[in-house]
Amino acid sequence: FQKCSIDTYLATGLEFLKTVERPPLDEYILRRNNLAKALVADGIDAFVVEPGYTFSYYANVTQPDWEPEERPFLMVIRPSKLPNGDVIANTSFLVPHFEEIRARLLNMPFPEEISTITYEEHWNPYITLWESPIWGETLSPILMVDEEMRDFIARGLSLNAFDVVGLSGEVEAVRQIKTERELGILKAVNTGTVEAIRAMRKCLYHGVTENEVAEVLDNTVRAAGMDPFFDIVEFGKQAALPHGGHDGTATLKPGDFVLIDVGAHLYGYSSDVCRTFYPPFFPNPPPPEYNVTEKLKVWQLVLDAQAASVKQMVPNGTASAVDLAARGVIEAAGYGDEFTHRLGHSIGIKAHESPYLNKGNFEAILRPGMVFTSEPGVYVLNQFGVRHEDILVVREDGEAENISGGSARSPWEP
């Protein structure tokens, strides 16, 4: 099974990998400069972040590189206006004095030596930051932080002369609107993940367990140099729970739908795709004794709902309108109560990012370069579940672009 899956995958040629590369130095400079312009637009003095996804986005340092602890290690990005009027980022790092050399050894993507503000163990690090000359004449700088900032650090800043506000506005949009390089990586990792599902499907056999499929699929994804980070594998009635919860010992039988939702990483970017299909040993057309009429009807219904949502992924549309387009198709067919979750979410270096596509999100306005999942589903308790998930990018003109290898074509061609 494992050899068949990997061999089938590699036989595709892995074309999706041939035009993609790790983000270079100038990509990180562009991101920080875009952030600086957004800070000016939002009236913010600096964006402050500690190691995590956002730190990685702007400086290529992940939590495994520098695990957050009780001593603050903060990146402080401020806007700086050039004589020609252009705005660029000016970045400093608040770091314990004894860790300064370690911070410099991280080889962060900066064209010059990084600028540090150091503090001793017995000092107040937040006062040290406030007393640094980077603020000029500003007495109470306005700092923006995101949801990854731990509460004790946000409180430390706000109790020591800083005005701390949450993530919003143009600053939040910087990560939401992907560059073409980012889109290239997202296309590669999501197409590669879908192709791995398609390759593995051809090797499925009667009696295999959900756990065995998950393991084989993970190793298949790794064969392309990607790093899997979650699998949902459900057979038959198990798929009526959208995110599973069973022990993975269910075995595959003729007539079972297979629902697979999987994510992987490539160059720091995430895939998140789902396919629902029949195994290769189940004939097309199905034998009448299996009574799969409703399953086939729902499979197509969910695909139609996804197509309706894609038509609403246009500039200046709302997140709510995208969800409601898919939900309306499913409700009209009488399965509204069986569509139990939101339609989707944005995706990037995290699998789940804002904005979120739910029917109550009227505030989020779609902009070119935003990337979303569309993952409608119908879950008939104790019988079966169907979900189709693809990745779409909002384009300036025309319909949103599928960057996950094309949508499913039939239960035998996922």
Residue ranges, per PLM feature:
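Active-site neighborhoods and metal-handling regions in enzymes and metal-associated proteins
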Residues: F1-P414
